[in-house]
Amino acid sequence: MLQYSRYPFHPPLDAYVDMALVAAWEAGATLLGYYMRTEAGMVRLKENSSPVTEADLESHRVLVRVLRQAAPDLPILSEEARMIPHAERAPWSRYWLIDPLDGTKGFLKRTDEFTVNIALVEKGAPVVGVVHAPALQQTFVAVKGAGAYRLGDNGQWVRLSTVRVDPKRIRILASRHHAGPVVQRLLERLTGAETVSMDGALKFCLIAEGRADLYYRDGPTMEWDTAAGQCILEEAGGVVRTAEGDTLTYNKVELVNPPFVAAGDPSIDWTSRIRSIFENGDWMGA
């Protein structure tokens, strides 16, 4: 298990950070065991045509075991478990939302950019977020109201902070496997834009570190894809907004997220600016 100094989080949520870190690191070690093999185990396609491997399922089992041992009364909603009806989920005021292997396609292609995502959700919002990238040996954590941090090489927690955007040099994140036509149009219309390719929840973390500015996702994502990363980015000073300008919320009737923009500079009305780009071709038109 990784060694780390105590982080600057306070009760009562600090106990949940400990639980999430232990679970993420144990699941990450399990994933690395599969990753080092020639094959990641049997691969099958889910109903939405996304791949799932033995590694996904074993990571799920590890997370559920560790989290239930630590907090047996907390419900767990996982990508790799049965779909729980909203009528059953609606009364949950606090629960774990987990993605045991975010970036399965990258995992299979050996990009190193797969993660374990764990969020503690309260009343529709993520209040604890952990994103662990085992192949990169990187761990990110955030607590609502207490900031976002990356675990440094020396075991110390490094506070994360987003940066103000340079409109002449916008660094736009694009998924390696999901860059849709709307994102392509955005890249074409932004003069001087730089593209940064990254898989999964690490896109939120790059913006939180100030290494990228903008991530626009028009394709489908699920709540477990975004909750932990959203918590990290927002606590680093960034924003995550829907096309209507609303914050992403959780434990909805349908677990599919709407299109959204994640950005580091909160001083900009990103949804209006992006709309202006498509309508006028002018970044400063909004």
Model regions and ranges:
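Oxyanion/phosphate-interacting regions
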Residues: M1-V22, R185-R189, C205-A286
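N-terminal subdomain of lithium-sensitive/metallo-dependent phosphomonoesterases centered on the IMPase/IPPase/PAP
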Residues: M1-L101, R185-E188, E279-A286
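Acidic beta-strand-loop-alpha-helix segment within the catalytic core
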Residues: I118-C205, E254-A286
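Short loop/edge segments at beta-strand edges and connector loops
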Residues: S78-E80, D199, E244
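Residue-level signal for inorganic ion chemistry
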Residues: L31, D56, L67, T104, ...
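Glycine-rich active-site/cofactor-binding loop and its immediate structural neighborhood
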Residues: W92-L136
